[in-house]
Amino acid sequence: YLLSGSLSDGSVVIYTDENVKVRLILNGVSINSSSSAAIYVKSADKVFITLAPDTENVLSNGGTYETVNDNNIDSAIFSKSDLTLNGSGSLKVTAKEGHGVVSKDDLVITGGTYNIEAASQGLSGKDSIRILDGDFTVTAGKDALHAENEDDKEKGFVYIAGGTFALASSGDGISASGDMTLLDGTYTITAGGGSENGEDHQEERPGGSGGPGEPGGMLPSGERPQGEPGEKLQEESETTDEGEASETASTKGIKTNGSLAISGGTYTIYAADDGFHSNSDIAISG
């Protein structure tokens, strides 16, 4: 299907058999939906969105989302099936609420120029995010790139073979619940406003030695930090004035709950928390 022209308030909905592959070619299109996704994939095997050469395409949401048949549609592009973005044109995605692009299966991007502004996640794939190439500028109220599958630890992974990434996020720059593999690419990531917004903390050093000027791991107040040695204070929660615990957003540059493998690329990271973080192993080569 070849799409061009403007739609001021409406959606393109794909609803077909689950064994059917669908291709949309965006040939200079502008679609805004005041209450749903500009493009909504309700049912299909795989959907390919191709950015035609030398075209500028715009997809946006006006700031609200209405639940349709118990489906929580919460992004400017929302797919319940595998979604692939490709082509050499450009795509601007604006989500005043919710996410920029969401796939509830695999999100694959092989090329194109993307400018994404989202109140929540910029790019989100439940089973995986796989990027071969592309030029990405993402501003996100949560994570810029986010892959998470709570049901299957083998999924929720991120694989990036190349591309140029300028990511600014209030949460993590790139986050995965599974493993993460970065083969190449140029990354400029600002997470949580940068290191100047990081919390000052003192860690207990191995052998009981603290930081400079604070023997034995003592805090400037004279108190010892809580928790096990090496554990960062206030990692996951903080206490409000009312005494109730509230979740603290993770503000790491690159974070994975699985293994992190980096074999190439150029990285410039400004993060309020860790630049690189893995809850498993980190392997760097190349």
Set out the residue ranges of the language-model regions.
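A composition-driven surface/loop motif
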Residues: 1-286
